[in-house]
Amino acid sequence: MNKGNSLEKNRRLIPSNQEMDKAIYALRDVAIETPLVEIPELAERLQLNSLHLKLESMQRTGSFKFRGAYWRCMQLSQKERHRGVVAFSSGNFAQALPVAAAFIGTSAKIVMPIDAPAIKRLRAESFGADVILTKHGKKGREVVAAQMAQKIAKKENRALLHPFDDVHMIAGNSSTAIEIIETLNVKNHPLPHHVFCCAGGGGLISGIAMGFARYSPNTKVVPVEPEGFDSTRQSLNCGKATTLKLSNNSICDALQALRPGDAPFACLSSIKMGIPTIVVDKQVRAAMALAYDLRRIMLEPSGAAPLAALIKHGDEMKGKDIIIIASGANIQPEDFVRYIKEGVPE
């Protein structure tokens, strides 16, 4: 592929300003404008100028995923809506998609890894999804689930929706960044120097990054990944989307994509990002315990990973205005209790 064709392909993978505006306008009527909570005592402890948590954990279905799912469903034709949709998901998109689908009067079938958290499967079913479980063995859990979703789409003539590698998903997720900027502007508060955001397949962080690149270009969005699943970091470092070998496990079940999506990577590589960082499970458990201790905020591990990254890099952030994207809260209560007990310093 020559350079001109490559640039044209990348443009098709990056949401336009016009589409982001349409998505933001549409979502105002259906999405929750989630709280932006200031944590001055932790800011003082870390010697930051300010610290806010954007609680996407309080979005419909308990994570940011509803934003992209709804806007993607809005793009379906009437014929596609009649036939229904299918997608693979490790859990959070599995819950968001049936709710988004119901808004437009269609049905959702979800393929999930058999080891996805039970609460995510049960909640997906309670929201109206028809859930199919897959065993993955030594293969990547999302690879196997994606293959099954493709087979179902072909067999049942359903629209196949990708949970993160989709320009419309990214446009929907950009609304999170716009809400943050609007809230800070109303408060006459400085825009952030850094935004810490988890990176799995890249659907959330690419939307966040595109929103800030447009309205706060000096803000650096920092990708946060669990150890062994740093595909975004490796991809940005080498300049192309890179597939990892499965070599690790993590309590961050929503951040186990072995490769960033083409559309998210096109977005992230088109702007200047913050330096990607890696967190380990011990740091994530400590961040979960800290969020609960400070504000009784309940986060799933993936949602707490950005806070863990801030704690890890606190010395580098002194004097800065920081935003943490708390992306989700879908976790078994008994697992949450166990993790925060393990995360409390001895």
Model-found features: residue ranges?
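PLP-dependent amino-acid enzyme catalytic core
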Residues: M1-E346
